[in-house]
Regions:
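Proline-centered helix-kink/hinge sites
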Residues: 2, 131, 149, 185, ...
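RNA pseudouridine synthases
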Residues: 2-98, 108, 118-121, 164, ...
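Pseudouridine synthase
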Residues: 13-21, 52, 63, 92, ...
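Conserved structural locus in ABC ATPase nucleotide-binding domains
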Residues: 34, 113, 125-127
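Histidine-centered divalent metal-coordination motifs
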Residues: 36, 137-140, 242
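Residue-level signal for inorganic ion chemistry
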Residues: 47, 73, 114, 139, ...
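Short clusters of hydrophobic/aromatic residues that line enzyme substrate/ligand-binding pockets
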Residues: 86, 90, 99-103, 150, ...
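Extended, charge-rich low-complexity interaction segments
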Residues: 103-115
């Protein structure tokens, strides 16, 4: 899914993926179905179900945690420690004309694992993130709570989410659903990945960290889910709590 395309419509959203599903029938007996979502400004892997049965199985796999997702983000600053588990409850609150998610110890449980893959001095870092839970704007709020908001995320990071002197591309949200692993009945696990959008590649070049990134994650070959998840299992050693 490209950044800027909403998955579902709303009172002010008339262009969205849900309204395009008929075009994606591609000769099948029925259009595909949505089984999960990405934020409008998040790019990356989005799975659609071809049949009602597939939709039911996929929905169950997301609820039971049989599926796993890996996100990549560029954040301003560098998290310390370099890997950890963020355990901060979240709640939705009305904002200035739009709803906003805030950290709330009495809110819904929200857990995210992260790892620093590469960094450009102290100004920015590339993170691999796994949402253990799936709350609205979870990764965005959790990264901001670390003091390292996602680049371009003015909603949750304010001015700290931008790098002075950067170009237009660096002012967009730098959050990408890199890979997903889902059960494929009778065939084991299905692994899917999405190439990085141009804006994130361009930002890395501006930060002059592209060589380190390619060496760390094998970008040229488009890394598999295993390399996207490197280190995830050991992340829970450190926790952030409210």
């Amino acid at each position: 899914k490209p950044a800027g395309l909403a998955v579902q419509g709303g009172s002010k959203t008339t262009r969205h993926l849900d309204g395009m599903l008929d075009v994606l029938t591609l000769g099948a007996a029925e259009p595909p179905r949505l089984v999960h979502r990405l934020d409008k400004d998040t790019s990356g892997v989005l799975v659609l179900a071809r049949t009602a049965k597939a939709a039911r199985l996929l929905t169950e796999s997301f609820r039971s945690k049989d599926s796993r997702k890996a996100y990549w983000a560029i954040v301003t600053g560098v998290p310390r420690p370099a890997m950890g588990r963020i355990n901060l409850g979240l709640d939705k609150r009305p904002g200035q004309g739009r709803e906003k998610v805030v950290v709330d110890e009495d809110g819904k449980a929200a857990i995210s694992d992260y790892r620093v893959i590469e960094h450009a001095g102290r100004s920015a870092a590339w993170l691999s993130l796994e949402p253990v839970t799936g709350r609205t704007h979870q990764l965005r709020v959790h990264c901001a709570a670390l003091g390292t908001p996602i680049l371009g995320d003015g909603k949750y990071g304010g001015k700290a989410a931008f790098i002075e002197g950067s170009d237009k591309a660096a002012r967009r949200l730098h959050l990408h659903a890199r890979a997903i692993r889902i059960p494929n009945p009778g065939r084991g696990m299905l692994q899917l990945s999405a190439p990085l959008p141009d804006q994130m590649n361009k930002t890395w070049k501006l930060l002059r960290v592209e060589e380190g990134i390619a060496a760390a994650a094998g970008l040229e070959a488009i890394p598999t889910l295993e390399s996207a998840y490197t280190g995830i299992e050991s992340i829970s050693a450190v926790s952030y709590t409210h």
